[in-house]
Amino acid sequence: MRFHVAGTQTAGVKKSAALVGFAGEIISVRAHLDTAPTGAAFVIDVNKNGTTLFTTQANRPTIAIAGTESTSTLPDVVSVAAGDRLSIDVDVIGSSVAGSDLYVTVSIKRATVQ
């Protein structure tokens, strides 16, 4: 699933959201900014039906100061069902330059039908 939040970033909840189309397991979460943050790292959160997937908050996708890519991150909660709503929160922005044009990819492996 792909999410996009256009423009200069501000902290806030439900910046972008989408419905999951099938049952499965999240295998990675990645984030990208077209303009790098400066002064502070950029941190996002991904929620399923309003609750964070990253119960260990230190594991949230983070883009380093002056960077544009997060590393691939595996959330603590990986199971999703058809109809679940995934949403993106922007928790921390750069303190000098916020960062702009956020892209987030949540990769989901479809559950095997038995």
Residue ranges, per PLM feature:
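Solvent-exposed, low-complexity segments and loops of surface/extracellular structural proteins
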Residues: 10, 52, 84-86
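Short secondary-structure boundary micro-motifs
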Residues: 1-3, 28-30, 56-63, 91
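Beta-sheet-rich sandwich/jelly-roll-like modules and their strand-loop junctions
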Residues: 1-43, 95-114
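Terminal beta-strand-rich extracellular "head" domains
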Residues: 35-82
